[in-house]
Curated annotation (Swiss-Prot):
Name by which UniProt lists this protein: GTP cyclohydrolase 1
GO cellular component: cytoplasm
DNA repair is among the record's keywords: no
Gene: folE
SUPFAM superfamilies: Tetrahydrobiopterin biosynthesis enzymes-like
Source organism of the structure: Xylella fastidiosa (strain M12)
């Protein structure tokens, strides 16, 4: 079941703010001191922004398509769509770039809509592998193209700021559907277009 547009109405703003105060006390802080008085409210408001993807259905962004494309049937690629997400294991930031390509099957979509699909999935608790598959599936299910390719690069704070503390490491994941999966030449053309390898730490 898709819970993307559902909100947990049983949890109030006040309860969410109290949860932040509990974490502050657990960390050894005093949430009543001046510098932290507004922190619970600010954190809850930030969460509303960071996780706004739960209130959206990414498929909706791809409903309006264009068929007057003068017979264009070659690959369409968007490179370097920046994103910010959060690891579902540690709630730590993931920052990176998404590259999306598809082979139209008689209709195309406005390029900004593909970026909105990326944003909608990124603004949730994620693992990069799942987000890669979700974006590809959304495009395939809604546009029915001849093929879809999605490559994501990400720098994971759960690896760079805790645990093993390895900075400068980026993770690359891919999902190929249709012709992108079945035809090596199509896949190679897509990978050549996107030129994976830009250091995401420069974002």
């Amino acid at each position: 079941m898709d819970h993307s547009k559902q909100q947990n109405a049983s949890i109030t703003q006040a309860q969410a703010e109290e949860a932040v105060r509990t974490l502050l006390r657990w960390a050894g802080e005093d949430p009543t001191r001046e510098g932290l008085l507004d922190t619970p409210r600010r954190v809850v408001e930030a969460y509303g922004d960071w996780f706004s993807g739960y209130r959206e259905d990414p498929h909706d962004y791809l409903q309006r398509t264009f068929e007057e494309i003068s017979g264009y049937d070659e690959m369409i690629v968007l490179r370097n769509i920046t994103y910010e997400s959060h690891c579902e294991h540690h709630m730590a930031p993931i920052i990176g770039k998404v590259h999306v390509g598809y082979l139209p099957n008689g209709k195309v979509v406005g390029i900004s809509k593909l970026a909105r699909v990326v944003e909608s999935y990124a603004r949730r608790f994620q693992i990069q592998e799942k987000m890669t598959a979700q974006i590809a599936a959304c495009i395939q299910e809604t546009l029915s193209p001849r093929g879809v390719g999605v490559v994501i690069e990400g720098a994971h704070a759960c690896m760079t700021t805790r645990g093993i503390h390895k900075r400068g490491v980026s993770m690359v994941t891919s999902k190929m559907l249709g012709t992108f999966r079945e035809d090596a030449r199509t896949r190679a053309e897509f990978l050549q277009f996107i030129e994976v390898g830009t250091n995401v730490m420069d974002l």
